[in-house]
């Protein structure tokens, strides 16, 4: 895998070129630190290295396999809703956020995937077409 360093502007340009429905992965900073052992998370733990409950390492980043083209992440909780239509790269990037479909989530009913949003400033790396785009 080739590492390519890009700026925030380069990140925005890269995201706009990704076609709807195309699978890629990204690493970004979590809103709240999460314990990898007990699964608990809390924003007040962001400055800690270890979980105050069980003492294990806290995760500050999240890795997800994602797809773009999300229609409405707040109202769509089941895979298949929203499909990959109705939203261009520019629309997915509104208000400093990236809307995406997270393929790594397993729902209570056994189905996979969840519609989500993340702050663009928190994206640290994107894996696409055999390249790792590292945001500086």
Protein language model regions, located:
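Short conserved beta-strand and strand-loop elements enriched in small hydrophobics
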Residues: 24-28, 100
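A short, sequence-level motif marking secondary-structure junctions
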Residues: 45-46, 67-76, 119-125
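Phosphate-interacting basic helix/loop segments used at nucleotide- and nucleic-acid interfaces
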Residues: 2-24
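Short, conserved turn/kink motifs that form compact alpha/beta structural patches or helix kinks used as
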Residues: 51-52, 61-111
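Short, compact, well-ordered microdomains
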Residues: 95-136
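Cys/His-rich microdomains that often coordinate metals
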Residues: 39-43, 58-60
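Short cysteine-rich clusters marking metal-coordination/redox-active sites
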Residues: 35-38, 51-54
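Residues immediately within or flanking Cys/His clusters that coordinate Zn2+
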Residues: 32, 48
